[in-house]
């Protein structure tokens, strides 16, 4: 059994905290092949580390409807159950296979308001080692413009490490 995660040990700049939690996540995930367990762990550890995270979790590509995302492991209030590719911030990330960094979600065309308290959002695509899109990782904040390139780079590195595709 892994040592209990203590987010209070993580200090320094945001970039340093991403690097520290990446090491912690890698240690906890070592030897665990199950993608659901890996997703649940990543979501929980990141939510515990960053105070500006309001909702943190995965939307997984539905194998029965490959142009649709279905809610996966997350931390936070009730998530939207399904999101079509191309709709909202998560759907845009899935369709474009590119990170979406949104300072004001209310100004984003087609934004899906799963929780009206969300003000800004970052969504990072998650790829299998063979390059297939398997999910998107969604983080919302109640603070406008809460995310920047440091978050995008830190999350991309953690997700690449956890799910096998180099960034």
Name each region found by the language model.
Residues 120-128:
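A short, aliphatic-rich beta-strand micro-motif
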Residues 93, 97, 131, 151-166:
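Interdomain signal-transducing alpha-helices
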Residues 144-151:
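A short acidic/glycine-rich loop-to-helix N-cap element
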Residues 61-64, 68-114:
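Regulatory sensory and allosteric helical modules in signal-transduction proteins
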Residues 127-141:
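Sensory-domain boundary capping and coupling elements
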């Amino acid at each position: 059994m892994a040592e209990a995660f203590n987010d209070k040990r993580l200090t320094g700049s945001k970039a340093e905290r991403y690097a520290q939690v990446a090491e912690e996540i890698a240690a906890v995930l070592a030897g665990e092949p199950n993608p659901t367990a890996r997703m649940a762990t990543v979501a929980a550890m990141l939510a515990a580390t960053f105070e500006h995270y309001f909702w943190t979790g995965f939307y997984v590509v539905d194998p029965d409807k490959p142009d649709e995302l279905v809610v996966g492991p997350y931390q936070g209030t009730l998530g939207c159950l399904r999101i079509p590719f191309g709709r909202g911030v998560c759907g845009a990330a899935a369709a474009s296979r590119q990170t979406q960094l949104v300072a004001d979600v209310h100004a984003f065309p087609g934004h899906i308001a799963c929780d009206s308290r969300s003000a800004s959002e970052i969504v990072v695509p998650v790829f299998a080692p063979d390059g297939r899109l398997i999910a998107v990782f969604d983080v919302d904040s109640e603070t406008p413009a809460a995310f920047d390139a440091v978050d995008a780079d830190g999350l991309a590195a953690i997700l690449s490490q956890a799910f096998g595709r180099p960034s």
